[in-house]
Amino acid sequence: MTEPLLPEPAVKPLLRQPGGRRRLLLIDDELSVARFIAHAAEECGYEAIITVSAESFRSQYLASDPDVVVLDLALPRSDGVELLRFLAEEKCRALVLPISGFDQRVLEAAVRLGTALGLRMAGPLQKPVRLQQLIDAMQGREAQDAGCIGF
């Protein structure tokens, strides 16, 4: 599990070896939630990259070319909508899974916005996230390709 420390150094692109592990990039200001998600992803063979700020998320996204993005909608100095727009501008091909403690209607609106922006959306998940909910949200081609039930 990769946890950038603040302040973060310049990010070097992570070159994936042919046949290398899939990458999951997540942003969450609650480190315990981020570690929980990262651990679940790593158990299914993903390389998990944790970010805690919008700035580090952007730089890690550009450097890592993730297969899955887990996006907390409520961040201290940013919000998930801003990051959804960033992902759309970057023509993100990753599966995007929004999570938050917000009301379910807000989460569903984020999924609709992401879809309208051309993103591949999954979920959403309301905090506190349960393992089975996380696994169910991640079902799809990524799950089958990774050879792990749920991821």
Predicted feature residues:
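Acidic catalytic/metal-coordinating carboxylates
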Residues: 52-53, 79-85
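Short acidic/polar segment at the start of the alpha1 helix of CheY-like receiver
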Residues: 30-34, 106
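The feature encodes the CheY-like receiver
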Residues: 76
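Non-catalytic signal-transmission and effector/linker regions of two-component phosphorelay proteins
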Residues: 1-25, 31, 38, 130-151
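Alpha4 helix (beta4-alpha4-beta5 surface) of REC/receiver domains from two-component response regulators
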Residues: 82-85, 102-123
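Active-site residues of response regulator receiver
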Residues: 72
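Conserved sequence signature across two-component system core domains
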Residues: 24-28, 51, 69
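Short hydrophobic/Thr-rich beta-strand motif most characteristic of the beta2 strand and flanking loop
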Residues: 45-53, 60, 125
